[in-house]
Amino acid sequence: MKTKIFSLANEEVGEISLNEDIFAVEFIRDDIIKQVIDWQRAKAMSGNHKTKTVSEVLGTTKKPFKQKGTGNARQGSLRSVQMRGGGVAHGPRVRSHATKLPKKVRKLGLIHALSEKCAEGKLLVIDSLKLDKPKTSALVNILNKFQGKSFFVIDGNEVDINFSLAAKNIYNTVIVPQIGANVYDIIRHEYVLLSQEAVSVLEERLR
């Protein structure tokens, strides 16, 4: 499958042949894409939520009032779950939310996400992702030429330091090396920009 190569000025500078098994899958599996996104989001959760149980909450274990004769329901401790300031029953505990997902499914998710963006016309191949200076204003002007609201930029094995620094302060713009390409960021950003080096490395990695 042939597609155009653009410069950072959004001008056509050539053509490149893309592997159809990676960038032009015929049937997009949304279920696989969702599986991989759920796996990513669960893995990213900190899991540090926690409430105190009866044994952990600060306070006395003294009986609040005598067993009989007050007309109240019997109580055994001021730290019980039904008392104000008491412990919490069955509350959240510190734990990992990470789940397991086979590597083949993760690989398929990336292939189908790239194919979906390509089918939408929102995946663009750029000849070079290098800037002379780390100027945010200059990069904003460049990205405005593509008329997109958000950009996920994938470079080769290494990211140009000037491009990376310039992109840091731009809302909804992320740049990563090819190893950082992931389904969640590909789907949530409007445009995916790939350098020519990224295309060749991704094709080798996902073959």
Swiss-Prot record:
Q: Name one GO biological process term.
A: translation
> What is this protein for, i.e. what is its function?
One of the primary rRNA binding proteins, this protein initially binds near the 5'-end of the 23S rRNA. It is important during the early stages of 50S assembly. It makes multiple contacts with different domains of the 23S rRNA in the assembled 50S subunit and ribosome.
The record, for Pfam families, names: Ribosomal_L4
For the keyword Ribonucleoprotein, the answer is: yes
Which PANTHER family does UniProt cross-reference here? Answer: 50S RIBOSOMAL PROTEIN L4, LARGE RIBOSOMAL SUBUNIT PROTEIN UL4M
NCBIfam families xref list: rplD_bact
On subunit structure and binding partners, the annotation says:
Part of the 50S ribosomal subunit.
The terms under GO molecular function for this entry are:
rRNA binding; structural constituent of ribosome
Q: Does the keyword Ribonucleoprotein apply?
A: yes
Q: Which UniProt keywords apply?
A: Ribonucleoprotein, Ribosomal protein, RNA-binding, rRNA-binding
State the name under which the record lists this protein.
Large ribosomal subunit protein uL4
What cellular component GO annotations does this protein have? ribonucleoprotein complex; ribosome
Q: Which domain of life is it from?
A: Bacteria
Family per similarity comment: Belongs to the universal ribosomal protein uL4 family.
Q: Which organism is it from?
A: Rickettsia africae (strain ESF-5)
Q: Which Gene3D superfamilies match?
A: 3.40.1370.10
